[in-house]
């Protein structure tokens, strides 16, 4: 059985699902948000994993105490993935620009394919 914070999901639904590029789905059984067919953002245990340009991911890992490398199911670290862990779900609103950057990054990658 997968564990995730349903309050986080409610806030992310509000933040993300108004964007016409974003659709909901699942990743390893966890709620996830896709841009086209590519995973952009997902809930995982007590946090939110997301894919970003490597430079942004590195900067957040160095400067933001709420971020850690995203390693779902014990997988190795990935240079473009981070996890944001917040206790209060409403605090994810402060990361709206980061979520938008993830969506744009995934969309641009698909345009280049």
Question: What residues fall within each predicted segment?
Answer:
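Charge-dense, helix-prone N-terminal extensions
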Residues: 1-113
